[in-house]
Amino acid sequence: IVNQKDGTVSNSGFMDELRLKLNAKVMLIRNIDTCDSLTNGQTGTLMAIEKDSSGYVKHLVVLFDRPAAGKQLRAKNPQLAKTHPGGTMIETYSWQYSLGKTGTGSTATLIQFPIILAHAITAHKTQGMTVYKPKTCSLDVTSAFEAAQAYVMLGRPQSLEQLFIPGQLDTNNIYASSKALEEYKKMNK
């Protein structure tokens, strides 16, 4: 959202300053190429921060948790495979925002890497995600506050061996909605 008075952009999903460190857990926050599984929510590990001769970061290299993510892009850049096996190059992304009434021609452009740190993510963000072996998944189901939210969290790992639940498991936080249970009963008649 663009502030009409000072032109600042808020609620864009981007930070004023992106600070990353090698081996940090990261997540894409925009769809880059849906056919190549480079989609919003895809997680991985930062392998490299590549800079140009003047010291500016030209691209990042990420080893995605899902092996299929970025496979087509990696095939187009075989040189990268020699220096960073399995790594996918992520370049800056730009978004344009209108600064005034539509059609006035005033725009702002936001340029940043479409990545954030992701050492911890919310249950809602994990919906549809798979935690691939051998990675482990530490889940705090005590924070579940909606029906089926614990199910969304518990269903992410591929096996029980990957699952770690710290503290005491309170089964009161694991429940389905009454409407879902009614539908389930109808289907089983």
Explain the meaning of each model-derived region:
Residues 1-22, 26:
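Mixed-charge, Lys/Arg-rich low-complexity intrinsically disordered regions
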Residues 22-189:
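C-terminal accessory regions
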